[in-house]
A protein has these predicted regions:
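C-terminal capping/extension of enzyme domains
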Residues: 1-23, 27-28, 39-41, 51-53, ...
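Short, conserved, surface-exposed binding loops centered on an aromatic residue
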Residues: 24, 86-89, 128-129
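Structural motif
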Residues: 30-31, 135
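Short hydrophobic-aromatic micro-motifs
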Residues: 32-34, 94-98, 183-184
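Short, well-ordered beta-to-alpha junction loops that form the rim of enzyme active sites
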Residues: 36-37, 138-143, 188
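Short, surface-exposed acidic-centric catalytic microdomains
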Residues: 42-115
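Short secondary-structure capping/junction motifs at helix and strand boundaries
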Residues: 70-71, 133-134, 155
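Internal catalytic-core helix/loop-beta-alpha segment
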Residues: 91-150
Length: 213
């Protein structure tokens, strides 16, 4: 199965990039990771979320759930095991998308600081498909600020903290009520973020234990 949004890829022109991936929303998902926007495709090693080989998201999940940071790494290759990642996320109820549906890159890199949001994601349309959602998780400043504005949360949570979500996104009809849900802000899995791998694992483990127990 392909997770590429070929229609969006085809219409990405004139400096505007539309999201190249379809939302990954497994049935019964309790956690929704929302980043800012994927890196350029030249940096991908898999056609899925957190596709950059030097981003440690899948190594962190490997360490948290299997005690092995290389659990999702293809031995001898610089890519991740996509089928195992998808199966794992479906079993655990972990969904993925981003807070922007279209962006303009102001510099030729993957930094959130140089992303201009052209079209924010319709968060209500996502959460309405996830009635069992217990936590929205962000790992970057831009994504956190965007989701706080969408949810009407006045104070942006600090890294390694969470706030209660008092109401679902505006425009939501049915589906997710937002009741009892939390917005968690975790440290970025990018190696550019100045925190040890072990400390990141500890932070992610705390969130997963709290939400999935």
């Amino acid at each position: 199965m392909s997770y590429l949004n070929t229609e969006n890829i085809a219409r990405s022109k004139g400096g505007v990039e539309y999201h190249p991936l379809k939302p990954f929303l497994p049935e019964g998902a309790k956690i929704l990771f929302l980043g800012s926007f994927p890196p350029q495709r030249k940096r991908w090693c898999i056609d899925f979320f957190y596709p950059n080989w030097i981003n440690d998201h899948w190594r962190i999940q490997g360490q948290v759930f299997f005690g092995d940071k290389n659990h999702f790494v293809c031995e001898g290759e610089k890519r991740f095991k996509l089928d195992e990642i998808v199966r794992h996320c479906e079993e655990k109820g972990i969904a993925f998308f981003d807070t922007s549906t279209a962006v303009r890159r102001l510099k030729d890199n993957a930094s959130d600081k140089f992303l201009e949001v052209v079209e924010p994601t319709d968060i209500a349309a996502l959460t309405n498909q996830l009635p069992q959602l217990k936590a929205i998780v962000t790992t970057g400043e831009k994504a956190t600020q965007t989701i706080c504005a969408t949810l009407g949360i006045p104070e942006v949570p600090k890294v390694n903290s969470y706030v209660a979500i008092s109401s679902p996104p505006k425009g939501g009809r049915g589906g997710w009520s937002g009741e009892g849900a939390l917005l968690w802000r975790l440290p970025s899995s990018s190696r550019a973020y100045p925190l040890s791998f072990e400390k990141k694992v500890e932070a992610y483990r705390k969130m997963f234990d709290a939400v999935l127990r």
